[in-house]
Curated annotation (Swiss-Prot):
It is a single-pass membrane protein. This is Protein TRL14. Signal peptide: none annotated. Disulfide bonds: none annotated. Keywords: Glycoprotein, Membrane, Transmembrane, Transmembrane helix, Virion. It comes from Human cytomegalovirus (strain AD169) (HHV-5). GO terms for cellular component: membrane; virion membrane. Belongs to the RL11 family. Glycans are attached at N24, N64, N72. The chain crosses the membrane at residues 143-163. It is found in: Virion membrane. Its main location: virion.
Length: 186
């Protein structure tokens, strides 16, 4: 399988694969690294259970398990690119040569944007809960009303419950002249 190389349209690209496999028989691997051999060697992508790219200021690229796409190709991007299978050590090597005609080099800093994070709360974890509450059309003061009802019912229950308890007799002190009984019912 030929790696996809996209660059300035006036640049001519010469590439070839150097290994024992045919280009059109490349199978899809998992746990793949794309490596650019230069000084220093640069691991561009790590693929497996995750997708990690190492951005650089002088090369724009995108990768997956089977292809490496280089954007705005310049002579700086020429060299050896390797697709390395981490599980068994198998490698596919690609050599890229860029031949410049009478053209200007492509502009750096024009990499395509893959992911754009949103600053709003539409994609956050609790956004569905917030939307459900907003759609319920419950007035804001309803919680205060329910709290007032609960407190009122509790006070009424306490008042009514206090009348059901049998009253204790009230005792008064008798005059001093009755020595036998000190307390009596009033």
């Amino acid at each position: 399988m030929r790696p996809q190389l996209r660059g300035n349209q006036r640049n001519r690209i010469r590439w070839w694969q150097h290994n024992s496999k045919k280009c059109n028989q490349t199978e899809k691997w998992h746990n793949v690294d794309w490596i650019h051999y230069e000084y220093p060697t640069h691991k561009m992508c790590e693929l497996g259970n995750y997708h990690q790219t190492t951005p650089r200021h002088d090369i724009c690229f995108d990768c997956n398990d089977t292809s490496l796409t280089i954007y705005n190709l310049t002579t700086r991007n020429a060299g050896k690119y390797t697709r390395h299978h981490r599980d068994n050590g198998q490698e596919e090597n690609y050599y890229v040569t860029v031949l410049i005609g009478d053209t200007t080099l492509s502009t750096l800093g024009t990499c395509p944007v893959r992911y754009k994070e949103s600053r709003n709360t539409e994609n956050t974890i609790g956004s569905n809960i917030i939307k459900t509450i907003e759609k319920a059309n419950i007035p804001l003061g309803i919680h205060a009303v329910w709290a007032g009802v609960v407190v009122s019912v509790a006070l009424i229950a306490l008042y009514m419950g206090s009348h059901r308890i049998p009253k204790k007799p009230h005792y008064t002190k008798l005059p001093k002249y009755d020595p036998d009984e000190f307390w009596t019912k009033a």
